[in-house]
Amino acid sequence: MPLIFVVALTSCTISRFIVYNFADVKDYKKFPSRPLASNETKFKFSNALKENYPKVLRANNDSISFENYIEKNKTLAFLIIKNDTIQYEKYFNGYSQESIIPSFSMAKSVTSILIGCAIDDKIINSIDEPITKYIPELIENGFEKVSIKHLLQMTSAIKFRESYISPFAESASFYYGNNLKRKTTNLKLKGNPGEKFEYVSGNTQLLGLVLERALKNKTITSYFQEKLWTPLEMEYDASWSTDMKNNGIEKTFCCINARARDFAKIGRLYLNKGKWNGKQIISQKWVEESTKIDKSDGSDAGYQYQ
């Protein structure tokens, strides 16, 4: 009887994993979401398409055409933009400029940017604050020494299995399951924060809960709209998937659903040190701090703020 009860409790997530299998580019159709509205004034990159990409890629005495390589790796969109001009733009596997493309883990970088915006807005005081200031429920799990910076740098030491093939891993539970707030506040530690880098999506979902608590009566999506989507004059409507239709939270480790050109504008913002057409959208200090190489003991390959 206990085994049946446990299976019943977990069956929804597991059954979704079995039915849907691995994460898919069409998953945004399966999840509830919050909308992002395009701007009335739309920023558009200029077009000057050139064939200045490598024709052939060579490695280990093998060669493959550039576009065949991209398509073979299941790429959906590939753009090269220089000086606000699109020099190469190609879509694959039936996709086009109008197609919605999921961000997957690019959402982690957006979440990092929004933490920076919240610090600029003095909604969050510092990345050195303990996350228990915003999520006091985690005190009983020993999270008092885990800071926002630890989450940003993936050195929190949370117990979280980042597996893409097991339906029992936390990554599957977070992706396919609901009630992420409960799942997040039930996380445990397996070591001391700040000692070891470990890439796990649970860090970013914790950041999402910190941000939601700091925003109080505003959703993460509405803050994203206010701080980035509208100021960056996005061309298209978009969305951010949530765990539940009612009273849900954004899946901040993944799941922003937008067009390739609009995603590229976030890159343009960082290329210009946080400025957009002369206006400082996010502080230059945050851009520099979040992208510099991290050489601390717990880092790996220079990973900084997601």
Which residues fall in each region the model found?
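Catalytic-site signature segments of enzymes, centered on catalytic residues
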Residues: E98, I165-D243
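Stable alpha-helical elements in mature extracytoplasmic
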Residues: D62, F66, I127-P130, E144-I148, ...
